[in-house]
Amino acid sequence: MISLKIYFVLIFLFLKGINSAYVSNEEGETVDFTFSGFYANLTYPNEISELNYVEGNYLSTRIVRFNGSFYCDTTILSETNNVTGSCYVANCANDTVLEICDSGKEVHFTDMSGTTWSADTFTENLYWFCGGDGNKPNMTTAAAMNSDIDSYYVYGNWTIDTADSTVADYTCNYTHFQEAGDIEKGDVYTASADSSDSSSASSTIFKPSYFISCLLSVGLYLVLNF
């Protein structure tokens, strides 16, 4: 009789392979995850799961695999500051912006180098959100890094200015790195940051495929051996 350990490993690898092939071969498949970072002068929940509505602020990111390229869809939502649905979409493969839509408020971003971009000028420089090879992307090296996208790296350190004297400005700092090969359809990414340090964050990945593989492995083992 096949050993229990070997049996589980074989079933797991088989199901994992099916899931990975399905994700990588389908155009337009999406993986949704949520990042919860530290906002310097606002109160918000430290950890957010999935894309559920919560009081406070959060940043959600979607990765889409399409024709071998990665498109980063980053949306900044702020219930407190009433900057709702500000949407910026970049093509990480060739560093061009696909589209941009904002909520109607004037929003300014300050990037890692300290350069400030308005919503209008930022459309031409959005690709610094995206990077490859595990390097921190920036305005000048993003094109070279994205020539070989084998990982997804997002690094943010900017200030959002609502251009409204009645609404407080705030700064968002976050860092996220994830190997592209580890991202699968249905994954739920959650991250939390210590409010005492806006640059630190911890993250966990829950993979439904792993859980299902485990259940099926146990079920098949019980059926065949008892």
Swiss-Prot record:
Inactivation phenotype: Impairs heme import into cell; simultaneous disruption of str3 exacerbates the effect.
Region named Heme binding: 72-101
MF term (GO), any: heme receptor activity
Keyword Zinc-finger set for record: no
Induction: Induced in iron-deplete conditions (at protein level). Repressed in iron-replete conditions by transcriptional repressor fep1.
Signal peptide, first to last residue: 1-20
Location(s), subcellular: Cell membrane; Vacuole membrane
Superkingdom of source: Eukaryota
Positions of the pro-segment in this chain: 200-226
Predominant location: membrane
Protein's UniProt keywords contain Membrane: yes
Any one GO CC term of the record: vacuolar membrane
Transmembrane segments: none
Keyword line: Cell membrane, Glycoprotein, GPI-anchor, Lipoprotein, Membrane, Signal, Vacuole
Residues lipid-modified (GPI-anchor amidated serine): 199
Membrane topology value: Lipid-anchor; GPI-anchor
GO process annotations (BP): cellular response to iron ion starvation; heme import into cell; heme transport
Biological function: High affinity heme transporter involved in the assimilation of exogenous heme during conditions of low cellular iron.
Protein name: High affinity heme transporter
Organism: Schizosaccharomyces pombe (strain 972 / ATCC 24843)
Gene name of the encoded protein: shu1
